[in-house]
Amino acid sequence: MSQFIKYYKKYLLKYFFKIPPWLLRILLPLKRKSIRGFKIDYQSYAYINLNPKSTLHSVKDEDLLKIRKIIESNKIKSRLSLKPKIPVNTKDHFIHSKSSGAKMLLREYIPNISNPHKIILFFHGGGWSIDSVETYHDMIKYFSDYLKIRIFSLEYSLAPENKFPHALLEAEDAFNWLINNRNNPKHISICGDSAGAHMVASLSYKLLKQNSEMPNSLLMIYPPCDPFFQKESIELFKDKYFLLNKDLYWFWDRLKNNKENENDPLFNHLKFDLEKKFPPTILVTAGFDPICDEGNAYAEILKKQGTEIKVLNYPTLFHNFAFMTKLNAAKSAVHNFLDEYKKIV
């Protein structure tokens, strides 16, 4: 019987995005728990349940390089992001990092019609330890076409080989490279999802504290902010909704260089202490995400700081939904926050 269920799930997963939502409820009946007055989107929950739970938290550092390649291959094959309506061209730039001495890939996405002045610098997610420009390739093509803006996606160095603040310094190098290549910082927006959103916050704080030139706007998509895991959502959504707590602890541990990092505002965003405000900001949270509460807490800090911030919460969605626009609810949410982003970018 268990073998039949295994093959049945494999079959459903193969044809998942061709199955109408009404039929999916018949083929895969699931009970959803109401939490905080909401139930997770059915199609999203079905997709999560058909996929095996992550075991990333059990991976040893010496095996991580091999695991990264497997994850990248699987994500590229799965094609979870919708394709742009009009093909988006790309151009690879290899830039020098002054901080690390490394040569970094900065991939430029060029939509068919774009504003010649505005650009976005993007940092991908993956817990600072996995994923790449390639795994996010389809998502950024879709974003670029929808926004009609050129996007530069950075291949930053991953942890644990490169601990905090290595990737942050590379992110700063990429921002400065864009400015040095005749781009007015007033026309540059910075965006990231998950670990990449954490980098957006860190870089913005660093630039502000240095009195450096600032980007014109920020988009942070479900940022991790609290390495102490103090918020209620950590426990509420710990093991059923894509991002597992065990993986979350593992990610932070890979990034951390020493215990002092935990109280560094560049690492722990709930320790932000600047009185200056950020540029106009959009912060996205998902209701069924273990880190949604810390994202909301961080947004409150920015509000008190005087930042013009809009928090967009999608109460029936989960961590990483922006990567999965083939899911109907995820697509609607992405369109919604990108429409809001257009107003400030």
Language-model regions, residue ranges each:
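A glycine/proline-hinged amphipathic helix-loop "lid/cap" segment
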Residues: 1-109
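Alpha/beta-hydrolase superfamily serine-hydrolase fold, recognizing
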Residues: 4-18, 23, 89-345
